[in-house]
Amino acid sequence: MELWVSPKECANLPGLPKTSAGVIYVAKKQGWQNRTRAGVKGGKAIEYNANSLPVEAKAALLLRQGEIETSLGYFEIARPTLEAHDYDREALWSKWDNASDSQRRLAEKWLPAVQAADEMLNQGISTKTAFATVAGHYQVSASTLRDKYYQVQKFAKPDWAAALVDGRGASRRNVHKSEFDEDAWQFLIADYLRPEKPAFRKCYERLELAAREHGWSIPSRATAFRRIQQLDEAMVVACREGEHALMHLIPAQQRTVEHLDAMQWINGDGYLHNVFVRWFNGDVIRPKTWFWQDVKTRKILGWRCDVSENIDSIRLSFMDVVTRYGIPEDFHITIDNTRGAANKWLTGGAPNRYRFKVKEDDPKGLFLLMGAKMHWTSVVAGKGWGQAKPVERAFGVGGLEEYVDKHPALAGAYTGPNPQAKPDNYGDRAVDAELFLKTLAEGVAMFNARTGRETEMCGGKLSFDDVFEREYARTIVRKPTEEQKRMLLLPAEAVNVSRKGEFTLKVGGSLKGAKNVYYNMALMNAGVKKVVVRFDPQQLHSTVYCYTLDGRFICEAECLAPVAFNDAAAGREYRRRQKQLKSATKAAIKAQKQMDALEVAELLPQIAEPAAPESRIVGIFRPSGNTERVKNQERDDEYETERDEYLNHSLDILEQNRRKKAI
């Protein structure tokens, strides 16, 4: 068999130059047999007969091509063929994935040295020479290189990197189960994986006691702890911390709000302040404030403070929001499904309300009457999923606690977030409610005005106020009607109305603790004895709104505030109102009463005395003398008197007998 090779294929063979030009020069000088290669366009390509090459070069060329020349001809060198089932590639590369960075770097260091040694051996260089040459070039041990080379020979070349990974690290992490009796292992994990979260040291102490009792074979504490660390993390969290903590192992969803409009979606929640406040009724409490926040811009839109989270603070703060900013066409609200927030007065009629018994005839709640769509935060393992509401972040580190609870005006009243974090001046003072509410308003304003907010819409530059002002200008809203505003006010129980048109309202026990008298002249003529009153507890000395028991609006009533005994101006105002009432009443009488009493008398018909009726019974006349008639008349009178005495005596006897029987 004749073998023809190009000058490039001959380059770098033993005894030949390293370049094609050098090979051509040697070939011309030594007179190698050559020919022009066919099929080459645009020039001539020369190739040489392999028999013209020096013996060393020819042997290396044949070895490179997998052949060898003998006296009996050319033989193809047999190489081991690797079948797919010889080894598990996935398991091999899994070892690579589980290796440490240092193990992978070490494998990558040995890979080029092993590849170089393999190429030199394929070119016919002796094993000793090849390993020594490569080891000297890469500055590694020749014997170690030889071990690495034979280590990868049973794998395909693309898998050599994974095959070179040192498995000693993995072996150190594997604990032989033969050291640990299965019963002992089950005892340990049953003790360790409990909601009480016992310390591992104490679990191991109990394991040692049980092992001595039952003759179990157990490893050292460090080995057992490594075995515990190999347990599935999700399983450990679920058993020791609960389902709620397990759900937190899933990364939080990243949501965008860019597609929303300002005021299109709001969310609310209550925040318990860490401040002692002397409330309006004299009690020292930690008040709770309900906040409404715009989801897109994160601005706090409205709030109301109370002794607890209740329907009053929620509906009044909602009234503040819609009164100031209006109601968008596509309106959404997200709140927790708590007893205070998800009550029927606010959310009744919502199809997805899972609080209290839902009835088909439930009246629509105020949120739905305002055109809002209700959304509830999730409940996981009996606990709320707070990360679903952006307003929760306003209560976190650097939030409203820093702006309000730790304000210098409230120094000495701060309680700390928990009993373990009480300040040294804990309980020094309790601030008045007026001061606290003023500080709360200032803190919310500072919270909204701080620039450089790291939110999607602020971009690390703007404040919540800046973004809301920009986005709100592009939002279409409708202002609530007066009737809608009155619907959001607090409804009082039915109160009695006096004939003067005044009534007493005992309201605001939780918000103000007030008792006021209200009046409107229209109530005198409303024809009702009781009215239902709607009011704002923070405006009790202003106007309240009166409704009939079936919900029809009657009028507004103003508060009759007490005045000083020597207040002449108030006296003049009272006399002016008396004159006004007198004049208005006279005008009403004049308009209503259009005839006087004389005119009424003239219109009455003349009534004549009726004639005596005629008797239709005729008696028999028996004449007698006058003397006899008088005598008989006297006898009759005596008889009548005596008969009456007997009758009265008989009645007395009967009454006495009746009483005896009754006794």
From Swiss-Prot:
Resulting phenotype, D567N: Almost no effect on both the DNA cleavage and joining activities without bloing tetramer assembly
Regions recorded as binding DNA: 176-196
A GO molecular function held by the record: double-stranded DNA endonuclease activity
Positions of the UniProt region annotated as Involved in flaps endonuclease activity: 575-579
Keyword vocabulary terms for this entry: DNA excision, DNA integration, DNA recombination, DNA replication, DNA-binding, Early protein, Host cytoplasm, Hydrolase, Latency-replication decision, Ligase, Magnesium, Metal-binding, Nuclease, Transposable element, Transposition, Viral DNA replication
Induction: Expressed in the early phase of the viral replicative cycle. Expression of early genes is repressed by viral Repc (latency) and favored by viral Ner protein.
S-S bridge residues: none
SUPFAM superfamilies, sorted: Homeodomain-like, mu transposase, C-terminal domain, Putative DNA-binding domain, Ribonuclease H-like
Annotated region (1-beta, viral genome ends binding), positions in chain: 77-174
Compartments, record wording: Host cytoplasm
Region (Interaction with MuB): 605-663
Cofactor(s) named in the record: Mg(2+)
Binding site for Mg(2+): D269, D336, E392
Region (1-gamma, viral genome ends binding): 175-247
EC number from the UniProt entry: 3.1.22.-, 6.5.1.-
One example of a Gene Ontology biological process annotation: viral DNA genome replication
Effect seen on changing D550N: Almost no effect on both the DNA cleavage and joining activities without bloing tetramer assembly
Residues of the HTH Mu-type domain: 1-69
Miscellaneous comment as given in the Swiss-Prot or TrEMBL entry: This enzyme is structurally similar to and performs the same endonucleotidic reaction as retroviral integrases, RNase H, RuvC holliday resolvases and RAG proteins.
Entry domain remark: The catalytic domain contains two distinct activities, the cleavage and strand transfer activity and the flaps endonuclease activity. The N-terminal HTH Mu-type domain 1-alpha is responsible for sequence-specific DNA binding to the IAS. Two adjacent regions 1-beta and 1-gamma bind to the ends of the viral genome. Contains a D-x(n)-D-x(35)-E motif, named for the conserved glutamic acid and aspartic acid residues and the invariant 35 amino acid spacing between the second and third acidic residues. These residues coordinate the metal ions required for nucleophile activation. Each acidic residue of the D,D(35)E motif is independently essential for the 3'-processing and strand transfer activities.
Quaternary structure and partners: Homotetramer. Part of the transpososome complex composed of a DDE-recombinase A tetramer synapsing the ends of the viral genome and the enhancer element. Interacts with target DNA activator B; this interaction brings DDE-recombinase A to the transposition target site. Interacts with host ClpX; this interaction remodels the transpososome for replication and is required for the flaps endonuclease activity of DDE-recombinase A.
Function: Responsible for viral genome integration into the host chromosome. During integration of the incoming virus, DDE-recombinase A cleaves both viral DNA ends and the resulting 3'-OH perform a nucleophilic attack of the host DNA. The 5' flanking DNA attached to the ends of the viral genome (flaps) are resected by the DDE-recombinase A endonuclease activity, with the help of host chaperone ClpX. The gaps created in the host chromosome by the viral genome insertion are repaired by the host primary machinery for double-strand break repair. Responsible for replication of the viral genome by replicative transposition. During replicative transposition, DDE-recombinase A is part of the transpososome complex. DDE-recombinase A cleaves the viral DNA and the resulting 3'-OH performs a nucleophilic attack of the host DNA. The 5' flanking DNA is not resected and an intermediary structure is formed. This structure is resolved by target-primed replication leading to two copies of the viral genome (the original one and the copied one).
Protein name: DDE-recombinase A
The species this protein was found in: Escherichia phage Mu
Protein encoded by which gene: A
